[in-house]
Design a protein with these regions (language model features):
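Active-site helix of classical SDR
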Residues: 127, 169, 177
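Conserved glycine-rich cofactor-binding loop
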Residues: 12, 19-20, 43
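Short C-terminal tail/terminal secondary-structure segment
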Residues: 2-4, 101, 158, 237, ...
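Alpha-helical segment proximal to the catalytic Tyr-Lys
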Residues: 132, 182-186, 245
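C-terminal helical subdomain
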Residues: 193, 215-243, 247, 256
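Substrate-binding pocket helix/loop in short-chain dehydrogenase/reductase
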Residues: 102-104, 108-116, 217
């Protein structure tokens, strides 16, 4: 196997929501593969801590506190990245609000807006800012393209009860990714999405600690187990690598077979 096909040396990658969970695993793997990574989260202290962990392992990282649902904060992230690292080659739109089951008849507009702003609107406008920067940097279509990777969800494929807003937002992210791929290809940018299923993270570990919950969840999954964050990271790192240069506009479910079960 030609390991250079997975090498990210010289690339600059922004991973939103990377102080913990899936985003953290993605950032650490991309750094291990040679990328300079930008760690983002709401608290600067948490961002700096993860960046320091990466640098202690020989990687390159900076931390930039960011609220992806705030336009000024998004702009500061892009500006700071370019000022400190010189460019942007990879964007992973990972930050968002997790599914919090609430039936449609109990939904209120404030909760609806919170989910949509974080899980769809932020993805759209974060991608817009970074794509503008990538266009300015210049790249011929098909020549070592820039990458935008969006985190969708299995909830955007299946139709889970109580996840009307979250599921709709993630389904929209999937279709947005396809449209982005078509529109941004002319600037040498590929756009793909990943749909995680149930993943053990800080946000889900309490739920997964209950044996009844674990049994109920694994029953829905063909491989009969939940995923670990690194299993999402390996796919993201692949999509960011030279090995995936000819892939654009696709959704990759990483769900252990949940969406086919």
């Amino acid at each position: 196997m030609d390991t250079k096909m997975y090498d990210l040396t010289g690339k600059v990658a922004i991973i939103t929501g990377s102080t913990r969970g899936i985003g953290n695993a993605i950032a650490k793997l991309m750094a291990k593969n040679g990328a300079a990574v930008v760690i983002t989260g709401r608290k600067q202290e948490a961002c700096d801590k993860v960046a320091a962990e990466i640098e202690a392992e020989g990687g390159k990282a900076i931390g930039v506190a960011t609220s992806v649902d705030d336009p000024a904060s998004r702009e500061n992230l892009v500006k700071t990245t370019v000022e400190k690292l010189g460019r942007i080659d990879i964007l992973v739109n990972n930050a968002g609000v997790g599914g919090q089951p609430r039936n449609m008849l109990d939904m209120d507009e404030e909760f609806y807006d919170t989910i949509m702003n974080a899980d769809l609107k932020a993805v759209y406008f974060m991608s817009q800012l970074v794509a503008r920067q990538m266009k300015e940097q210049g790249r011929e279509p098909g020549v070592d393209p820039y990458r935008i990777i969006n985190m969708s969800s299995a909830a955007g494929i299946k139709s889970p009860r109580g996840d009307t807003v979250y599921g709709a937002a993630k389904a929209a992210v999937t279709h947005l990714t396809r449209i982005m791929a078509n529109e941004l290809a002319r600037y040498g940018i590929t756009c793909n999405a990943i749909a995680p299923g149930y993943v053990l993270t800080d946000m889900t570990k309490d739920v997964m600690a209950d044996e009844k919950n674990v049994a109920a969840v694994t029953k829905m999954i063909s491989l009969r187990r939940y995923a670990m964050p690194v299993e999402m990271a390996t796919v993201a790192a692949f999509l960011a690598s030279p090995a995936a240069a000819y892939i654009t506009g696709v959704l990759i479910p990483v769900d252990g077979g949940m969406t086919i079960n």
